[in-house]
């Protein structure tokens, strides 16, 4: 009796570990990498500016006669999310096949009259018909705004941007993540750019909380769904 109890303990522990591992599998993130620019190095002491009208230290690294569009690491760009996709697919297949065969004996030896008689007059026919149809459609709309940070500048001048917005409501939280590459010439004077003009755009919208847990299938239900042969 003691031996059976000892043998059952590892089995129960393995089942509990398996259940804990399958309890909640977090989805893989779409946006990977840093979501903000690294902190800049501490400023070096410089000589006191003596200009009476224009002082470079008061305007950063921007020239006097150029706008303040983002061009350096750490600058801010506002992305206007205007994603809308529509996809539809339809398939129709019709096949048909007919066949026939006739077999008859016009003459046979006399000693086989009682055996054959009229049984060899055979007519065989067959047909095969198959019809199949399929249709699928998908619609996706995502609108909003998110402010990102320039995390890198490519050799050709394009900007690598990334950002995250988190919103906590009651006991749940939602976050939007965005990353991509944007041409500085696409940025408007109000420091905004449409998401449709961002290359390699990755948009992620996730939620955590009670509503997200309700939409997730339980681990035991997933186990029986995988093990079921039907």
Swiss-Prot record:
Residues 34-53 are annotated as: Disordered. Disulfide bonds: none annotated. GO terms for molecular function: cytoskeletal motor activity. It is a lipid-anchor. Residues 1-21 form the signal peptide. Coiled coil: none annotated. GO terms for cellular component: bacterial-type flagellum basal body, distal rod, L ring; cell outer membrane. It comes from the Bacteria. It is found in: Cell outer membrane; Bacterial flagellum basal body. A lipid is attached at residue 22 (S-diacylglycerol cysteine). A lipid is attached at residue 22 (N-palmitoyl cysteine). GO terms for biological process: bacterial-type flagellum-dependent cell motility. Residues 36-46 have a biased composition (Pro residues). Keywords: Bacterial flagellum, Cell outer membrane, Lipoprotein, Membrane, Palmitate, Signal. The keyword Membrane applies. Its main location: membrane. InterPro entries: Flag_Lring. Assembles around the rod to form the L-ring and probably protects the motor/basal body from shearing forces during rotation. Belongs to the FlgH family. The basal body constitutes a major portion of the flagellar organelle and consists of four rings (L,P,S, and M) mounted on a central rod. This is Flagellar L-ring protein.
């Amino acid at each position: 009796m003691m031996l059976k109890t000892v043998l059952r303990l590892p089995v129960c522990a393995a089942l509990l570990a398996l259940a804990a591992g399958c309890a909640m599998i977090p989805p893989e993130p779409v946006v990977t990498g840093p979501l903000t620019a690294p902190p800049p190095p501490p400023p070096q002491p410089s000589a006191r500016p003596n200009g009476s009208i224009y002082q470079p230290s008061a305007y950063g690294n921007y020239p006097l006669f150029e706008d303040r569009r983002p061009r350096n690491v750490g600058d801010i760009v506002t992305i206007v999310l205007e994603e809308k996709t529509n996809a539809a697919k339809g398939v129709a297949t019709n096949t048909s096949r007919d066949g026939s065969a006739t077999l008859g004996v016009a003459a046979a030896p006399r000693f086989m009259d009682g055996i054959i008689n009229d049984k060899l007059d055979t007519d065989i026919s067959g047909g095969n018909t198959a019809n199949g149809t399929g249709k699928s459609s998908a619609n996706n709309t995502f609108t909003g705004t998110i402010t990102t940070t320039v995390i890198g500048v490519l050799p050709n001048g394009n900007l690598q941007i990334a950002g995250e917005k988190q919103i906590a409501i009651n006991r749940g939280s939602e976050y939007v993540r965005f990353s991509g590459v944007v041409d500085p010439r696409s940025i408007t004077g109000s420091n905004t750019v449409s998401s449709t003009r961002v290359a390699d755009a990755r948009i992620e919208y996730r939620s955590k909380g009670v509503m997200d847990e309700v939409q997730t299938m339980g681990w035991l239900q997933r186990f029986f769904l995988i093990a079921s042969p039907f």
